[in-house]
């Protein structure tokens, strides 16, 4: 009976914001012992826990600050848990005509909406007089920066990105996730209004409070703010389009070309991007129209190597039951930490298209080694064959298509000519639609 109780309790914890994994440890003796009085065994009834909502007084104060702000900014990281959460965030932004910076811990805000302002994030933070952070993983890093320049005895320098009199509001359930040892708090950031609550659950009350607090005489100013933001959104979209066109026919293949070739094959499907895209300059979230909460599941909670494909396979399993097409851009070094998950996907017939971002290196580390070498006036590259030691995956080059094939997945590549992308991807998409995992190995630019 204790196991059943623990399992239901663990499930309740995992499904209550902030949603995080729960581990159950079963003693070996318990697993091997004979069960007595089987008739008395029972599984407790599961009743979902209502997510915590923000205090009414704090909600009103936050609404007052936002309604009277000249330059309010909304920053969301893991705010929208559901389709309803995306809709609520749009309502709040439209009520204020406030720009939204989506940090993409989840798909919080449609990038097709003119209030989506990721491209201007740093500038908007610096201009804001009121900033509201919704489920931010790292509020300090949102409003501050670190200059890794070797000053201060090698520690670097910290700098604030906000005005001295800017007001900060936080709604986050992470404050309720205090653990016995390791924490997820990041650096401490002083804020003016702080609510230990689930942001999505608090948004309806906040939206209503904002509407009541908006001064009648500010309607024209708010509309003008929205028009200015819309103009900036259009200009940013055009800059992104132009930037994506650079090196379109280059070899190795540009990551923007790869992203758009994939989109051309899946745009008419009910698709879901189930991997992070930071390593390929975030082209999918910058170029693909994303307006559904499952269009992007968000990136990892940290920077752990080996996260990508296991997370993508798990999301693809959930999407299989929903009838969605799952696609994952898979970094090469990341895959080598857990290649066996390809077998898992093939064994359980989990439909997933994985497109390799094969830059033949741990490029995050390559850039860091180069930066440190510059600082210390050292050579970062050691000969033609060795290159930057410990950061390249070449000599020999890994054939990821053969690796995937050996695990039972459909595969194609390595592809080095961008003209070969479309036909290879088309066949891979058909394999995934037939219910199997597929991997296309694409040799790419570093970012």
Range-by-range predicted roles:
Residues 12-18, 58-73, 92-95, 125, ...:
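Glycine-rich phosphate/diphosphate-binding loops that line cofactor/substrate pockets in enzymes
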Residues 1-32, 107, 125, 133, ...:
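Conserved thiamine diphosphate
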Residues 34-47, 234-246, 292-295, 380-385, ...:
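Gly-rich Lys/Arg/Thr-decorated short loops/hinges at beta-loop-alpha junctions or inter-strand turns
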Residues 229-318:
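Active-site diphosphate/adenylate-binding microenvironment
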Residues 9, 13-68, 242:
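Conformationally flexible catalytic loops at phosphate/diphosphate-handling active centers
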């Amino acid at each position: 009976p204790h196991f059943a109780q623990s399992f239901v309790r663990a499930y309740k914890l995992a499904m209550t914001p902030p949603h995080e994994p729960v581990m159950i440890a079963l003693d070996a003796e318990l697993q091997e012992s004979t069960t007595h009085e089987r008739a008395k065994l029972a599984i407790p009834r599961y009743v979902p826990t209502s997510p915590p909502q923000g205090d009414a007084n704090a909600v009103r104060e936050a609404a007052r600050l936002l309604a009277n702000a000249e330059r309010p900014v909304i920053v969301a990281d893991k705010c929208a848990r559901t389709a309803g959460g995306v809709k609520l965030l749009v309502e709040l932004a439209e009520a204020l005509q406030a720009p939204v910076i989506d940090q993409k811990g989840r798909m919080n805000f449609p990038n097709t909406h003119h209030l989506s302002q990721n491209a201007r994030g740093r500038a908007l933070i610096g201009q804001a007089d009121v900033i509201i952070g919704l489920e931010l993983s790292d509020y300090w890093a949102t409003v501050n920066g670190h200059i890794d320049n070797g000053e201060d005895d090698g520690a670097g320098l910290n700098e604030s990105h906000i005005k001295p009199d800017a007001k900060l509001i936080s709604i986050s359930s992470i404050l309720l996730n205090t653990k016995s040892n390791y924490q997820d708090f990041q650096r401490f950031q002083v804020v003016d209004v702080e609510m230990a609550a689930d942001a999505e659950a608090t948004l309806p009350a906040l939206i209503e409070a904002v509407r009541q607090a908006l001064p009648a005489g500010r309607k024209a100013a708010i509309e003008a703010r929205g028009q200015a933001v819309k103009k900036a959104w259009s200009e940013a979209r055009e800059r992104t389009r132009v930037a994506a066109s650079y090196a379109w026919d280059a070899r190795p293949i540009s990551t923007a070309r790869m992203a758009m070739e994939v989109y051309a094959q899946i745009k008419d499907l009910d698709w879901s991007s189930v991997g992070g895209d930071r390593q390929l300059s975030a082209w999918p979230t910058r170029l693909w129209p994303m307006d559904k909460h499952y269009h992007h599941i968000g990136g990892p909670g940290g920077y752990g190597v080996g996260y990508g494909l296991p997370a993508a396979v798990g999301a693809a399993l959930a999407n299989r039951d929903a009838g969605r097409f799952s696609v994952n851009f898979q970094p090469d070094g990341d895959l080598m930490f857990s290649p066996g998950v390809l077998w898992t996907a093939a064994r359980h017939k989990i439909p997933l298209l994985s497109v390799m971002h094969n830059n033949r290196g741990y490029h995050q580390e390559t850039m860091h080694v180069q930066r440190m070498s510059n600082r210390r006036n050292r050579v970062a590259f050691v000969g033609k064959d060795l290159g930057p030691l410990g950061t390249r995956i070449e000599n020999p080059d890994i054939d990821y298509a053969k690796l995937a094939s050996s695990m039972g997945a459909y595969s194609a590549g390595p592809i080095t000519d961008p003209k070969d992308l479309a036909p290879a991807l088309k066949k891979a998409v058909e394999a995934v639609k037939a219910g199997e995992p597929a991997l296309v190995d694409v040799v790419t630019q570093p970012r």
